C-alpha cells in the first residue's frame, strides 16, 4: 500500500459540490492499494502513518506524530483520500498504466478497512469517497510531503 502524506494547516475534500471531509492542522494522506495488498499491509501502513514524526517539537525538530502535533497531547486531523493513480506505472510511453493498482472492488475494501482502522486508533479522521471525482484543497505546511509504501 502507498500513502502520499502532506503536513497541512488545513485541508478539505469535496464531491459534487459538498464537503465530505475537512480538517485543520494535521495530515492529508492520499492512499492507494496495490495488487496483492492485504489487511496486514494496511495495518502496517497505518501504524507508520500514525507514528511518523513530521510535526515540530519545541526545539523546531520534526519529532512529533499526528497524535501529538503540539507536544502537549493535541491530536491533529487525518484526512484520508483514495487515489489509485499513485500505483501508476510510468516507465514507458506517455500514458500511465494503472495495472499495478488493486482492482476497484479490492481497492475499495482495503480503503474502507484502512479508514475503519484509523478511526479506531485516532480521534479525528475524515475522508473523501472511494472512486468519486474529488476536489482536494490544502495548505501544505512547510511544505512537508512524504511517500510511504509498504509491501504485503
From Swiss-Prot:
Its main location: cytoplasm. It catalyses: glycyl-tRNA(Ala) + H2O = tRNA(Ala) + glycine + H(+); a D-aminoacyl-tRNA + H2O = a tRNA + a D-alpha-amino acid + H(+). Its EC number is 3.1.1.96. The lineage of its organism: Bacteria, Pseudomonadati, Pseudomonadota, Betaproteobacteria, Burkholderiales. InterPro entries: Daa-tRNA_deacyls_DTD, DTD-like_sf. Belongs to the DTD family. It holds the Pfam family Tyr_Deacylase. One of its GO terms (biological process) is D-amino acid catabolic process. A Gly-cisPro motif from one monomer fits into the active site of the other monomer to allow specific chiral rejection of L-amino acids. It comes from Burkholderia cenocepacia (strain ATCC BAA-245 / DSM 16553 / LMG 16656 / NCTC 13227 / J2315 / CF5610) (Burkholderia cepacia (strain J2315)). It comes from the Bacteria. The keyword Coiled coil does not apply. It is found in: Cytoplasm. GO terms for cellular component: cytoplasm. Homodimer. An aminoacyl-tRNA editing enzyme that deacylates mischarged D-aminoacyl-tRNAs. Also deacylates mischarged glycyl-tRNA(Ala), protecting cells against glycine mischarging by AlaRS. Acts via tRNA-based rather than protein-based catalysis; rejects L-amino acids rather than detecting D-amino acids in the active site. By recycling D-aminoacyl-tRNA to D-amino acids and free tRNA molecules, this enzyme counteracts the toxicity associated with the formation of D-aminoacyl-tRNA entities in vivo and helps enforce protein L-homochirality. The gene is dtd. A motif (Gly-cisPro motif, important for rejection of L-amino acids) lies at residues 142-143. Keywords: Cytoplasm, Hydrolase, RNA-binding, tRNA-binding. One of its GO terms (molecular function) is Gly-tRNA(Ala) deacylase activity. It is an enzyme of class 3 (hydrolase). This is D-aminoacyl-tRNA deacylase.
Amino acid at each position: 500500500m502507498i500513502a502520499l502524506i502532506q503536513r497541512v494547516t488545513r485541508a478539505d475534500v469535496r464531491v459534487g459540490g459538498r464537503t465530505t471531509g475537512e480538517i485543520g492542522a494535521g495530515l492529508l494522506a492520499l492512499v492507494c492499494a496495490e495488487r496483492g495488498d492485504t489487511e496486514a499491509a494496511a495495518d502496517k501502513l497505518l501504524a507508520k502513518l500514525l507514528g511518523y514524526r513530521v510535526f515540530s517539537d519545541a526545539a523546531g525538530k520534526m519529532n512529533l506524530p499526528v497524535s501529538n502535533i503540539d507536544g502537549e497531547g493535541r491530536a491533529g486531523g487525518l484526512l484520508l483520500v483514495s487515489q489509485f493513480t499513485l500505483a501508476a506505472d510510468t516507465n514507458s510511453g506517455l500514458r500511465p498504466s494503472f495495472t499495478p493498482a488493486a482492482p476497484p472492488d479490492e481497492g475499495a475494501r482495503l480503503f474502507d478497512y484502512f479508514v475503519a482502522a484509523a478511526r479506531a486508533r485516532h480521534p479525528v479522521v475524515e475522508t473523501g469517497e472511494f472512486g468519486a471525482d474529488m476536489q482536494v484543497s490544502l495548505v501544505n505546511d512547510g511544505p512537508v510531503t512524504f511517500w510511504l509504501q509498504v509491501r504485503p
